[in-house]
Design a protein with these regions (language model features):
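N-terminal Rossmann/SDR dinucleotide-binding element
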Residues: 258-271, 275-367
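Flexible, Lys/Arg-rich cytosolic regulatory linkers and terminal tails that connect or flank
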Residues: 2-7, 11, 231-294, 406
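Signature of alpha-helical transmembrane segments in polytopic membrane proteins
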Residues: 1-150, 240, 247, 371
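Conserved Rossmann-fold NAD(P)-dependent oxidoreductase catalytic core, especially the SDR/UDP-sugar
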Residues: 241, 256-257, 373, 377-436, ...
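Proline-aspartate-enriched helix->loop->beta-strand connector
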Residues: 211, 215-217, 317-318, 363, ...
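Hydrophobic/aromatic anchor residues within beta-strands of the central parallel beta-sheet
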Residues: 348, 390, 450-453
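A solvent-exposed beta-alpha-beta segment
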Residues: 45-49, 139-255, 328-332, 339, ...
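Strand-loop microenvironment adjacent to phosphate/nucleotide-handling motifs in alpha/beta enzyme folds
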Residues: 21, 280, 285-289, 441-458, ...
Length: 616
């Protein structure tokens, strides 16, 4: 078969989803039966007489019974490239049984049919119905043989529920590289059932025994709500077996067709083992906040800034101004966004938030309705060594953004803060606490609305410990932890960004919103999970304690005892009672900081930040 034709057929199959394929095969099957009865009639009676109504009734009944039987056998009128000879036999018996049943009904009232006519109809219908299905398997076999990739690995699917059914739709893609041997489920009672023609072999508690028996090379977890401890247990079993373990993509990703066609699985990552639940967006509120507006994001090339741009883009703003100091990161984010989202005017702007005149010029030119201020220096040890840079970027830079918001009459400013701003022993946290004061101070005197959003560590960000652990594991270890007792709050980048956008939508009067980070996680436990994810053991990749670095705390806090939570505006977003200082007093302090440097500057900022945590 011509290779171009083969590729065209496979490309065509990629366009259709499961429901569309079922409709296609249903239409094709009734067409095949109509053609079969016309040809049979012509062969028996010629073209002299028009076909009586009896034959139309017979064809309709035959197709109806055929569809019922195929549906009963779970074939849904569609055959995939994994179909066995038994599936083809079911189609043959379905055509035969439906034809005989229809003949019996018609014969009881309209005895016009010949047995030879029915036999010819059955043979023709079966041939026409099976021909494209068998051709499809031959096309795929030819494609697979030509690829020679050797990736057709024996696989177990874990999950016989809705997640497993959704995965099966992706799995039956023509470019899939899986050889699905069986399905395991938490519920052992499902043993003996079938999902998409694949048998449920039992509980995944028996994974070690079943994997050895069936020579399994890969396991894919398709239970979206699986508890993190169960993920960890499955991973441990797979590691002992030397079997690769994966997961299906997120449900919305599969439903929207955003995953890579034909793969249908992803690597299990640390977020699966930490069990962070996805945040549901208040679509109507955020739509009113963002749709048709001009949005400006500072630090748009960073982890949080770029994700805010992605999340905001879902609500179809008119324009997003991507403001950042690093040209490479802004370039990458800009091209990603214009590729993923249409109808939005993305404007890449290279600017330094320490340059007030440049900021004001950008704000007045594009007239944003909302500014998300994500630009900041955030590495604690680096800022301990460079306190002047922390002051210039996190304090003066925030002041410049807030002032430009006021001057350009921007409706709202949302600043990204951190849990390190609470009782800060380090210059980075202290500068972010002063930045909070700047935002609340401007809110007192400006017609614009200001707020800050405080949260903890973000998994996978450029400043996160995760990339450090990944690099250390890739190098063979050891994985270094400053103190085995150290804990941190963690949140995923999309979750943090969604909550920031939500908090901004609730901003009214200079609030400092505090995100519910869940329970703190021991860094040592995080390191152990990372080693497990890599497929190694602690004996292979040791974890060592190296001591706390300057400016670090054993335990982070989201608020101090005096910052009692005032109220909860929505799930996982609280409003803290934080101290507010007149902008004039803040200006005076900033003036004092300007003339200091080194340790003097560091001590002055830390002392001032800690003084401001008490409610007056």
């Amino acid at each position: 078969m011509n290779k171009k034709l083969t590729d065209y057929v496979i490309d065509l199959a990629e366009i259709l989803n499961k429901q569309q394929k079922q409709v296609f095969w249903g239409i094709f099957d009734i067409f095949s039966m109509v053609v079969s009865i016309i040809v049979s009639y012509i062969l028996f009676y010629g073209l002299i007489n028009p076909a009586p109504v009896d034959y139309i009734i017979y064809t309709s009944l035959a197709f109806l019974f055929y569809q019922l039987m195929i549906g009963f056998w779970g074939l849904n009128a569609s055959i995939s490239r994994y179909s066995k000879i038994t599936d083809f036999m079911k189609i043959f018996f379905g055509v035969t049984a439906s034809s005989v049943l229809s003949y019996s009904i018609c014969y009881a009232f309209l005895p016009l049919f010949s047995i030879r006519f029915i036999i010819l109809f059955i043979l023709l219908s079966t041939f026409l119905i099976l021909l494209p299905r068998i051709t499809w398997q031959l096309i795929y076999s030819r494609r697979k043989k030509g690829s020679g990739d050797g990736e057709h690995r024996r696989t177990f699917l874990i999950g016989a529920g809705d997640g497993g059914a959704l995965f099966m739709d992706s799995y039956q893609h023509p470019t899939s590289e899986l050889e699905l041997v069986g399905i395991l489920d938490k519920d052992s009672k499902k043993k003996g059932q079938k999902l998409g023609g694949i048998p449920v072999l039992g509980s995944y508690d028996n994974l070690p025994e079943l994997a050895k028996r069936h020579q399994i090379e890969r396991v894919i977890v398709a239970i979206p709500s699986l508890d993190p401890s169960e993920y960890e247990r499955i991973l441990q079993m797979c590691n002992k077996l030397g079997v690769k373990c994966y997961k299906m993509p997120k449900v919305e990703t599969v439903v929207q067709g955003l995953h890579q066609a034909g793969t249908g699985f992803q690597k299990i990552d640390i977020t699966d083992l930490l069990g962070r639940q996805e945040i549901r967006l208040d679509e109507s509120r955020l739509g009113a906040e963002l749709t048709g507006k001009t949005i400006l994001v500072t630090g748009a090339g960073g982890s949080i800034g770029s994700e805010i741009c992605r999340q905001v883009s879902r609500f179809n703003p008119e324009r997003i101004v991507l403001l950042g100091h690093g040209e490479n990161s802004i370039y990458l984010v800009y091209h990603e966004l214009i590729r993923k989202f249409q109808g939005i005017d993305y404007v890449p702007v290279i600017a330094d938030i320490q340059d007030y005149d440049r900021l004001l010029q950008v704000f007045e030119q594009y007239k944003p309705a909302i500014v998300y201020h994500a630009a900041a220096h955030k590495h604690v040890p680096m800022m301990e060594r460079n306190p002047k840079e922390a002051f210039k970027n996190n304090i003066r830079g925030t002041y410049n953004v807030a002032k430009a918001v006021d001057e350009a009459k921007v409706s709202k400013m949302v600043m990204i803060s951190t849990d390190k701003a609470v009782n800060p022993p380090n210059v980075m946290g202290a500068t972010k606490r002063v930045a909070e004061l700047i935002v609340t101070g401007f809110n007192q005197r400006s017609q614009s609305t200001y707020c800050a959003v405080r949260f903890g560590n973000v998994l996978g960000s450029r400043g996160s410990v995760i990339p450090v652990f990944e690099r250390q594991i890739a190098e063979g270890g050891p994985v270094t932890v400053t103190d085995f007792r150290m804990t941190r709050y963690f949140m995923t980048i999309p979750e943090a960004s969604r909550l920031v956008i939500h908090a901004g939508a609730y901003a009214k009067d200079g609030e400092v919103f505090i995100l519910d980070m869940g329970k703190p996680v021991k860094i040592y436990d995080l390191a152990k999970k990372m080693v497990l994810l890599s497929g190694h053991t602690e004996s292979e990749i040791p974890i060592v304690e190296v001591g706390i670095r300057p400016g670090e705390k054993l335990y982070e806090e989201l608020l101090v005892s005096t910052e009692l939570v005032d109220n909860q505006v929505m799930d996982k977003i609280f409003v803290g009672k934080v101290n507010v200082m007149p902008l004039e007093s803040i200006n005076q302090k900033i003036g004092e900081f300007r003339i200091l440097s080194g340790d003097e500057l560091k001590q002055a900022i830390i002392a001032f930040a800690n003084q401001t945590t008490h409610i007056e």
